[in-house]
Structure formats: structure tokens, C-alpha cells
Amino acid sequence: MGHVKILIAILVFITYSFVPVAYAQVKIGQKVPDFVTTTLDGQKFALKDYLKQPGNKVLILTFFATWCEPCGEDLKFLQKLQAQYGDQGLRVLCVFTGRISKVKAAKKYLEKLDVNLPVLLDKRRAISKRYKVTGLPCNYAIDREGFLKFKCLGCSEEVKRKFEENLRDLL
């Protein structure tokens, strides 16, 4: 019995010893993982290229799903911020974490909310895993050099107030 426990402990240690650095928790001030995916409309998207586009100063990367009720409120809030601060360099990109088979449902969800923000597809949750998304909605503020400036989870009034305050400091 003792040998089984030791063997399990060794296997767990070996397994977690080889977790790639790219999958480590993204910390404030660190460079965020780059990724390539497609948009909801089927266009190719590369984060590093997007960050370098003229006029882009701060990117909010928000992770959402259609089953997540607070995500709807968060998306409306972010659309309001995009309208308010877009001319100052704010860009908001939504990452749909649902299954690719649910793309039509995602489009309907966004139409129902009257949200017109660009949407990226998170195939097999690869982006969510790289960013260590543990709950929804989850927002990352990234500067044009690709560094994480702040992040938040949830959409309470206090979270939104602090989020907008931090955002204004970056713009």
C-alpha cells in the first residue's frame, strides 16, 4: 500500500514538472501569451499583430460564454467603455469559450444583447487555458506591447467601478 502512494506521488510530481511555462498564471506586469485563432466571422486573428495596429493603446480581452448570466452584463459594460474610450485607443475583444458547434448560439446571444464587439473563437479552450481563466466573465487589460496591466473576474458594481478607474489610468 505504501509503494502505491509513493508511486502516485512520483507520477503527480513528474506530470506537473513538465507543465509548459506558457501555461503558468499570467501575472500583472508580465507579457501575455500570444495566440492565433479565428473570429466569429471566420477571419484569421493573431494577438501580436492586433496589438501593434495604429491607434490601439489598451486591449481588453474578455472571456464569456452564452450560459454565463453575468457575462451579458459584462459585455454591455465593455461595449459602453469601447464607445466612451475607443477614440483614446481602447479596444475590446471578446473570447467565446463555448464549443465551436455553438457559434450560431453565440451570434444570437450577442444579437439579443445588442452587443457589436469583435468575437474570437476559443477552440478547445486553448486560449482560456493559456490565460488560466478560472471563472467568467474574466477580463484582461493588455497594453500595446503585450504586457498585462490588470485583470478582473466578475461583474459586480464594485468590480466595474474599479475596472473603469484602472482603465482611465492607462489611457
Name each region found by the language model.
Residues 59-62, 91-95, 118-121:
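Structural recognition of the beta-strand scaffold that forms the well-ordered cores
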Residues 109-115, 123-166:
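Thiol/disulfide oxidoreductase modules built on the thioredoxin-like
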Residues 57-59, 63-67, 135:
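Short pre-active-site segment immediately N-terminal to redox-active cysteine/selenocysteine motifs
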